[in-house]
Amino acid sequence: MGFVYIVMTGYYKNVHKRKQNQVDDGPEAKRVKSSAKVIDYSNPFAVSNMLEALDSGKFGSVSKELEEIADMRMDLVKRSIWLYPSLAYTVFEAEKTMDNQQVVEGVINLDDDDDDDTDVEKKALCVVPSSSEIVLLDSDDEDNERQRPMYQFQSTLVQHQKNQGDVTPLIPQCSFEEVDLGRGKEMPSAIKAIVEGQTSRGKVLPIENGVVNEKGVYVGVEEDDSDNESEAADEDLGNIWNEMALSIECSKDVARETSHKEKADVVEDCEHSFILKDDMGYVCRVCGVIEKSILEIIDVQFTKAKRNTRTYASETRTKRFGESDNELKFSEEGLMIGGLAAHPTHAAEMKPHQIEGFQFLCSNLVADDPGGCIMAHAPGSGKTFMIISFMQSFLAKYPQAKPLVVLPKGILPTWKKEFVRWQVEDIPLLDFYSAKAENRAQQLSILKQWMEKKSILFLGYQQFSTIVCDDTTDSLSCQEILLKVPSILILDEGHTPRNEDTNLLQSLAQVQTPRKVVLSGTLYQNHVKEVFNILNLVRPKFLKLDTSKSAVKRILAYTPCDVRGRLTGSNSDMASMFNETVEHTLQKSEDFTVKIKVIQDLREMTKKVLHYYKGDFLDELPGLADFTVVLNLSPKQLNEVKKLRREKRKFKVSAVGSAIYLHPKLKVFSDKSDDVSDTTMDEMVEKLDLNEGVKAKFFLNLINLCDSAGEKLLVFSQYLIPLKFLERLAALAKGWKLGKEVFVLTGNTSSEQREWSMETFNSSPDAKIFFGSIKACGEGISLVGASRILILDVPLNPSVTRQAIGRAFRPGQKKMVHAYRLIAGSSPEEEDHNTCFKKEVISKMWFEWNEYCGYQNFEVETIDVDEAGDTFLESPALREDIRVLYKR
């Protein structure tokens, strides 16, 4: 016996053809003919008759899917009663009659328990005869007699076959097709009341403002003999997509020609949600309306200047060099008002923090009152890519702009490589190094090229400071260009000019453009005043601005006057008093409530100028175990430490101590120049007792473990003598050679050798150790081939160590990273470590503290070596001299 599933297919709009093509010559052939299988809703008794037909069928056991259909039926009944209240008596009388009906023969009972017969009857599903029945909901518009019905109930017949007395249901093979028919027609109120809220497998069909979006889902059973129908359906679907493409093109023309007044009169039937698609532009994800074509986006932002447009250089020929008319020209062209957007190619690659950073740059640099800002994003977070994207958008919209990028000389190749990777148009990148412009005349020639065409100029910090501070006549022209022409100044590693007493900070402050951007992965270095020196660079007299005055007064009020007097003295100015007060409160105050108030005020006064990103993307990496390993010194080392404490010069203590803590024999080299020959070092290494130097012994045990585990090691130090010593120790102990297993990077390494060493170390399976001067391996260095890091000494600036660890713990790292900060116990180095940690606390509290941290004091965690979770520390040889182990 056949069963028929009654499913409401949506707003069916003539997509599937009928099984039999009935073609008549007369006009009446196109009208829907009434039959026993058609229910005409223009008949007032149609609903009543349909419900009676539904309720008079046979009943079967209810599965989960059939329950849904039964629920759909009940929903239709309720809405029909709401539309025709007179049906209520008929329906409820039918329900009473259903309780007294007996189960018809031939119905499969899927429930084994006789006790559940009552439930089965309650969940009975209406079954209509085995022939397919179609219900057409006709329009109430009687004038349009030839209009086909918009809504259709189509039944699906599922055959059951008997095999050896058992009844086995044949599982229907259903196909699902989604047809978007665009905007629907206005519905008569009666039909709208019936259809509104109907469900297709529990999903409500949307009706907005009385207009039906004719977007339906056809659910049917594929028939073996329906090849012709499938081909016809495919042809119809193809026509639909063609019609949609035509509609989109038509909508573009209408959008351009419609006036603003006419647009205001149009009643929107869609709450648009626009998204950016690379091939179309800003498109509504709901209805497909294009707000802005991709061609318009590119034309506005990335068109080249017209030939009849004067260049920046030609316009200044009639004026004295350096006049401020350059800024006036920007204002006339709308630079202060016009918005800026990232190129679609860049936007598709941006992460959320980069998108937020791009918008932050626009709010400061492209505004009515432009000013500088600080982008303090974590190392490896993509600051370079973000600012490259901004500069290309900036230049595309304002081709006359002159960007100047000042950065450490060593990372210039990295910047150029990134520019080539992300360029959307060919913008010349100029610098003095590649052009070998060594004298002022050659440098002036490069600067004139930069002025005359759309390009970007790169200079090193030292080079910029030297030119600006040069008093010779040859430098005057170069100085005038560098100080007056730049329209935007980018400072990578922007914490470099943090000392107010240096020529570098003073020379950068003389650049006249208000658009200055500082990029830094470690903004806080040593002291609070250094951060405010950088703030004063991008926003002159920052503490005296109206946005800062109230916060400054509140912060000063938190500290008693006698404490402020002891900190700064009676003759100190307000800025010095403020900086010392903040540093003392965050570092030494025992009242955590006061610390929180200071943090909140600091963030309030800098929120529009400073954009901070901690680096949550690092959580996606395999992980970081940052250990501080305090070692017990050998007797000979302790004797040398006693002598070292008599030294009053702090730098001397640090330099000599770094050698002694590694091995006492290195003391003889600490006073000499860094140029120690391999032969001299080899002779000393062959004679020494390794047990006398705990750090040297730790290093040798560590490289043995790394070699066995197939992991690569990074070794960082502030000084070259320790690096040279360990390089020769590894060569003699393991037979490793420089350039194959061992690589070295210092401040004297050329750019070409620098790039080659990084690429070879990361890619070569033979590479074992990379020795690096910790200051030379700053931003722009990626050494993700290594998974173990050894820090030999304690830089007084804690951010230097953080950057060194960031060389390996950054995007691209595939392994868990373990860092070991070696500390000589009972020595001045242990005291330096405590001082550095207090500086770290200030940075963490200022930028990273939140209400979820509670009243924690940011102390490092002391852990047992056995519970460190590091297999290397389980080695007896490696853990032999460990006195205490900390973990950040």
Curated annotation (Swiss-Prot):
It comes from Arabidopsis thaliana (Mouse-ear cress). A motif (DEAH box) lies at residues 492-495. A motif (Nuclear localization signal 2) lies at residues 305-312. SUPFAM superfamilies: P-loop containing nucleoside triphosphate hydrolases (SSF52540). Signal peptide: none annotated. Coiled coil: none annotated. One of its GO terms (biological process) is positive regulation of chromatin binding. This is Protein CHROMATIN REMODELING 35. Disruption phenotype: Reduced association of NRPE1 with chromatin, leading to altered chromatin binding of the DDR complex. Defective in RNA-directed non-CpG DNA methylation resulting in reactivation of silenced genes and enhancers, whereas methylation of centromeric and rDNA repeats is unaffected. Reduced accumulation of 24-nt siRNAs and reduced DNA methylation of siRNA-directed DNA methylation (RdDM) target loci. Increase in CpG DNA methylation leading to abnormal maintenance of some silenced genes. The keyword Nucleus applies. GO terms for cellular component: nucleus; pericentric heterochromatin; RNA polymerase IV transcription regulator complex; RNA polymerase V complex. It is found in: Nucleus. ATP binds at residues 377-384. It comes from the Eukaryota. GO terms for molecular function: ATP binding; DNA binding; helicase activity; hydrolase activity. InterPro entries: CLSY/DRD1, Helicase_ATP-bd, Helicase_C-like, P-loop_NTPase, SNF2-like_sf, SNF2/RAD54-like_C, SNF2_N. Part of the chromatin-remodeling complex (DDR complex) that contains at least DRD1, DMS3 and RDM1. The DDR complex recruits/activates the RNA polymerases V and acts during siRNA-directed DNA methylation (RdDM). Interacts with SUVH2. A motif (Nuclear localization signal 1) lies at residues 17-24. Residues 364-541 form the Helicase ATP-binding domain. Belongs to the helicase family. Residues 701-866 form the Helicase C-terminal domain. Keywords: ATP-binding, DNA-binding, Helicase, Hydrolase, Nucleotide-binding, Nucleus, Plant defense, RNA-mediated gene silencing. Subunit of the chromatin-remodeling complex (DDR complex) that mediates RNA polymerases IV and V (Pol IV and Pol V) recruitment to chromatin. Cooperates with Pol IV and Pol V to regulates RNA- and RNAi- (RNA interference) directed non-CpG de novo DNA methylation on cytosine of genes targeted for silencing and enhancers, also known as siRNA-directed DNA methylation (RdDM), thus leading to epigenetic modification of the genome and promoting/maintaining heterochromatin. Changing residue 807 to Q: In drd1-2; defective in RNA-directed non-CpG DNA methylation. Its main location: nucleus. Changing residue 494 to R: In drd1-1; defective in RNA-directed non-CpG DNA methylation.
